[in-house]
Amino acid sequence: TWFGKTGKTDALLSVIMRKRGNIYQSDGEHAPNKEKPAALFAKGSVGITDSNKAGASLRLYRNNTTEPGNSTQTHGDSGLRDRKTVQNDVQFWYQYAPVDNSLINVKSTLYLSDITIKTNGHNKTAEWRNNRTSGVNVVNRSHTLIFPGAHQLSYGAEYYRQQQKPEGSATLYPEGNIDFTSLYFQDEMTMKSYPVNIIVGSRYDRYKSFNPRAGELKAERLSPRAAISVSPTDWLMMYGSISSAFRAPTMAEMYRDDVHFYRKGKPNYWVPNLNLKPENNITREIGAGIQLDGLLTDNDRLQLKGGYFGTDARNYIATRVDMKRMRSYSYNVSRARIWGWDVQGNYQSDYVDWMLSYNRTESMDASSREWLGSGNPDTLISDISIPVGHRGVYAGWRAELSASATHVKKGDPHQAGYTIHSFSLSYKPVSVKGFEASVTLDNAFNKLAMNGKGVPLSGRTVSLYTRYQW
């Protein structure tokens, strides 16, 4: 990566090349995989005048892989495929922000993304598809003082069009197009006399898709939101929010009818569902955070943050995999409930850096009271870094503990809990600014671990990392 800045001009260039082989999993098997990804990213900007600025970015991505049709299968019986991905992204933007007018800071962005994927499978004709997205986004930000405080206003509009063209035997992504339009407004207010921040806003989305087989689908929604945070002391912050949103079904969710994956040589096919309805939901969140300085030593800091959220969804779009009939399809859950907790803590001092986090997410069909299986069981992650001596050497220990996954879809097997330990050693010399090197041993004891969907996690893995920034 190279970055440079001179006067009113700045630029960045990044090149990434990787090579990856079979994935060693915690059940002792190797998931068949071979890939050679390469990416180039370049961006730059120039200040034309004090009020005018323009920039552009370019991203090129190439990847040649040999992988199974179903990446969740451990054994190579899912049918290996040669897959080539070519992606080109380009973006241009212009910003006008007069220094003597706090009400005007407008930025316009034009973007184009073009992705071509070609796949050749054993005993199968070639698949080819192209996905092109082009759009424009305009947003203005205004700062003003209006009773009872300071306001930061953000308002704008976005439009994009997505086109998909398949050839060969590719029907997973059918021919068609999507037009998406949105208008949005937000006011973030900081009260003058009280330690209170208030955010109110709304967003209007309009979605239209067309497919020669199924015709036209239209959906629109006005989604308001509001949030408030209160800081009664310099060490305590409390917050709450309520927001609504909608999600229209994608073309793939409605029309796909290709092979989803193979198991023991038998294909599991996608079944189209042309009757999918748009999803609407309301999410409520509440939480609090504290920060304490100089708790045990003069230079230490303790940060704690915890929150709870609950989402009520109408026509929730879910996916069902029927292993008995060997078919998969998207469907609407008339009423769904998703909720969860998230707690994070961090203690920093000259002697230790310790991060601790806890998460749990549940999802349920509110009508039948059956689990949807898209949540996460109780998971606790502890990450400790301790300096060794005074020469920039740090020893790390990461432990991930997950409870058993029992709240799964009806008919799906329960997954046992697991504990994974990883160790690391890193070097950040004070005399060489910007240099960092580390070695990490993930899943050090090579424990068998499955996620909630039954996919084996990685087994014992050694990673080497180095970076130098100047």
Give each language-model segment a name.
Residues 1-32, 39-47, 55, 306, ...:
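Predominantly transmembrane beta-strands of Gram-negative outer membrane beta-barrel pores used
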